[in-house]
Amino acid sequence: MAINKSSLQSRINNLSKKTGVHQNILLRSFFFDAFLKRLSISKYASNFVFKGGFLLSTILGINFRATNDIDFLLKNTALEEENIISIMKEIASLNVGDNVDLSYKDFQEIREEDEYGGYKIIFEGRLENIKETISIDIATGDPITPSDVDYKYKCLLENQILDFKAYNFETIIAEKLQTILARGILNSRLKDYYDLYIIHKLRWNEINSEILKRAFINTCEYRNTIYNKEEAFQILESVMTDNKMNSFWTNYKNKNKFVGDVKFKETTDVIKLVLDIIFKN
């Protein structure tokens, strides 16, 4: 559906007042939707599996979790620079009648935070004279236990539903927990702590404990990091008492309004509960 600048600004202003989410975050989400609409009608739709913060934002609500990029697991397609750029440009060029232009800007290898690699593709979204930069992160390889799930994505500013594949909750939790344990006090990804906390608070009744156990084992084996219960709790204890980690949490909370007044100890207490479930005989 086509939209003009005035209508977009009005809708974003109204939604910002309703949700308390900053207008810049909502504008970015609008351009994310522009990409997703194009992806959904492309021949590559089944090759992209939703994961990461954007998936959580759409499931939990943007007022509980905002993000700066969209994360995908790529399957049945080569994760090679030339191939990925070609695919992404083709997707962005599709016409969905929304009055939005997506221009390819850059391609970067991801190494800073993801030791397992991947690529970041950057587009500039434009509607009339409104511009916003969006990032699409793509990785491959990690196992999904038992498999990806059908996911119906609802666009932010309209009632359009897009069909995709997505991670299940158990695999999301398993990957975040593995990252927390693997990085210990060297972890600057405080979003993993918050994500486990908010999933536990809002959607834990949907978690299958046996699938979660298998997902954690599969993720750890794939990433060559095997933990027993004692090791896992020792790592978590060192994190809980580390001044730098507590300082990181304060900074993360101050930068992300959706975190509210959640304390770092509340997140680590939740992680203890999750570890108890995983290591329960």
Question: What is the meaning of each model-derived region?
Answer:
Residues 55:
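Catalytic metal-binding/acid-base residues of hydrolase active sites
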